[in-house]
């Protein structure tokens, strides 16, 4: 069974996905996050200017993601195959030169802001869930997360939220 969880940034998709994992059990559940499928930068040295420019990219637009790869990975898991999930580093806006193995399990949970907008992914899902949370609550959650986990400043989070998220 493949379950898709979508919702705005900071809505609790990842938390909800981990709740499924906990409830259904790690032996029975593969959790796949759209976040791992962001396209990395061009590989040039990361200068402060380059990092600043990358921070201006609209990561909430479908063009920032490799949906074909994500769909092929979901299909592979559905076919009871193993996959190698890319690892994305939000601090450097880059995909790392390593992967994480994921295996087919009875329950596959896929979460991400745009997964329900992609027909090639939507057709693979048995169930879909949309997490709807008020904008002010999502902003509070995103601010806390991005500062703690992604090394962002308050100003950069506010700017990005107002420019590309909200």
Sequence positions of predicted segments:
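ATP-dependent NMP and nucleoside kinases share a basic, alpha-helical "lid"
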Residues: 96-150
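Conserved nucleotide-sensing/catalytic segment adjacent to the nucleotide-binding pocket
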Residues: 27-33, 39-90
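The conserved Walker
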Residues: 9
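Short gly/ser/thr-rich secondary-structure transition/capping motifs
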Residues: 87-96, 108-113, 163-166
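Small-molecule kinase domains that catalyze NTP-dependent phosphoryl transfer to phosphate-bearing small molecules
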Residues: 148-166
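Conserved lysine of the Walker
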Residues: 13
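Short hydrophobic/aromatic beta-strand immediately N-terminal to the Walker A/P-loop
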Residues: 2-4
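Hydrophobic positions on the alpha1 helix immediately C-terminal to the Walker A/P-loop
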Residues: 16, 20
């Amino acid at each position: 069974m493949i379950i898709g969880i979508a919702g705005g940034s900071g809505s609790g998709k990842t938390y909800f996905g981990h709740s499924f994992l906990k409830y259904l059990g790690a032996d029975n559940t593969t959790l796949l996050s759209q976040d791992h499928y962001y396209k990395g930068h061009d590989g040039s040295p990361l200068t402060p200017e380059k990092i600043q420019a990358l921070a201006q990219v609209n990561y909430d637009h479908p063009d920032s993601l490799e949906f074909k790869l994500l769909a092929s990975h979901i299909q592979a898991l559905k076919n009871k195959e193993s996959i190698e999930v890319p690892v994305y580093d939000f601090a450097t806006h880059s995909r790392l030169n390593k992967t994480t193995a994921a295996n087919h399990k009875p329950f596959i949970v896929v979460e991400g802001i745009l997964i329900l907008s992609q027909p090639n992914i939507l057709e693979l899902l048995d169930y879909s869930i949309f997490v709807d949370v008020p904008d002010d609550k999502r902003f509070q959650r995103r601010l806390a997360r991005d500062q703690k986990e992604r090394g962002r400043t308050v100003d950069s989070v506010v700017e990005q939220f107002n420019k590309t998220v909200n």
